[in-house]
Amino acid sequence: CRTYNIDGSEIKVINDIFDNLIEEMGMISQFEIPPLPKLAFDSDDVVAYDTVVCNKMADVIEKENRKMRDTTFIIAVFDSLFTCYYLDLNIANIEKQLPERSYIDALNAMKDSSIISYQLNLSQIKSNKRVTLRYYSEFPKGFKIWERENYNFLFSGTLKMSRIYFDKEKRVGLIYCSYACGRLCGEEVIICIRKISDKWSIEKTILLGVS
């Protein structure tokens, strides 16, 4: 059974940082078209280009991006906040990148076998971004999840989050997150969070891997 009781503090943390987490990991912005490259000038600082064509291209890009900004994306979230105990994390490397020593307690907690996974209730997670969360288990298994042509919605990707590991005073914490936007596209990070005036915010993102 994957259902374990928690005191609700971890859900509060997720709600406090979730919109920023979406931005940090590019779960929406990856779908926007990058702007036109800067024009390259010759040695005489003269360049020849068709302003009409360039302006039309810029207008098309902006129009498509506005459309994306009004679109709701679906994110497949793994059903459980999992324990980091069984992950092969390079703890020494993570420690070197921590914002400050106050995170050491939280880092040590990631090796605590008594902190176990628990099933996530997505209805408790709120977001002001244009996303809808669905359980990963509701999607096709394996690589079939990436067959976007079979969906009648815009599929952003998959998100996996760990339990939240706090220091003893619950002033700072660490979360392992991985986001995949395709078969060979994604990243895994450690999110460093800090509590300021009863609200949690992301202080630093430590990149563990990218593909």
What are these regions (language model features)?
Residues 192-210:
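Short beta-strand edge/turn micro-motifs at domain boundaries
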Residues 170-196:
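Exposed beta-sheet edge and beta->alpha loop/turn motif
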Residues 1-172, 180-181:
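Flexible low-complexity loop/turn motifs enriched in small/helix-breaking residues
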Residues 159-162, 178, 206-211:
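Short aromatic loop motif centered on NTY/YTY
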